[in-house]
Amino acid sequence: MAEDGLRLTNFYVSASVSSASRAGLLTGQLNTRNGVKGVGWPDSKGLPTDKITIANALKTKGYATGCFGKWHLGDLDGYLPTDRGFDYYYGIPYSNDMYIGYTHKFSPNCVFTDGYNLDKALQDQQLVKRNKNKAQLKKELNYASPLFENKEIIEYPCDQATTTYRYFNKAMEFIGKNKKQPFFVYLTPSMPHVPLFVSPQFKGKSKRGLYGDAVEEIDWNVGRLLNFLEKEGLSENTMVIFTSDNGPWLGMKENGGSALPLRDGKFSAYEGGVRTPCIIKWKNHIPAGKVSDHIIASIDIFPTLLELAQMDKSKYDLDGITLTKFISNPDNVEPRNRYLYVKDGKIVGIRQNDWIYLPQTGRRVTPKRNFEQELFNIRKDIGQKSNLFKKETKKAQEMEQLLQQQSH
């Protein structure tokens, strides 16, 4: 993809945890106001129902909309993908390290695995209903996740070793059925989130253990998808965006990934938590083999797709900006020079060009509280190791004033 498209080295997601990050991408709004601040759990509401998603918007233009994989924006009735603008959903509705919700309904044709039947599955649901200890439930139910089709469970426990392959298969099947009309596919594999699973043919494939194997499998399936689009004659009319929801879960050690040379990972407002890989490919529309270090944000995807679909952006309440001119001419167009760091629904820092200011006045910018004000020059210090707050006092004051302006 990078050889054929545009690689973004300063791409930011809206939050350093799953649900909040996904909410930012799908609404085009900062997490200060999109209603999702942290991580959702089974049997919970998620993205507020008054929020408009990319799928909601594109449906009004005649797009077929499909969601595949991890949803994590609410699993109660009214909050699942088919309630939020998607015509079809296939996947696990939250993180694959969680457990079945007691409100979920089983399809009459549900496939039960691992010695389960309907009675045993219903017992699991009653256990979840009685017990509110999340950690205990995860341990006792051993990550038994439900696989959904639209609003019903069609497999329990889900065979997680085959989910990546099946998600991509279903996405390609959906595209094939809808190739004569515009389509929007939101494809979010459960991997490489822990617990890690891979298909048998990918076990031991990498030199990076199970985590590397999971990444290899995703990579291979992305290749399958791109080949499918080419074979179907859709490559020139389909933009493909590849990214991640947040940085690596460092507490999981070798199974959690790494963001080096960036600092920290998931849960953190340092670069390793919110700066993720991103590649955009669109045959004959985006220059091939380009790399850009311009600041881009996931909230920019919504307004960009609206403009490409020739829709009126002014009808939507968005924080993102359009990237249409930038992606066709990345060398000469600078879309934005500023990014706001948001954690737990609050603005906790700002980047302006090469400077990053994190006041950290007791807020949880990192997994541990840090009361020290910090100023970094990210171009010279990509690992955020050298705090220049006391040395560059004029720049610190400038950034502090800028942050105050953005916070009001």
Briefly describe each language-model feature range:
Residues 1-374, 378, 382-408:
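Formylglycine-dependent sulfatase
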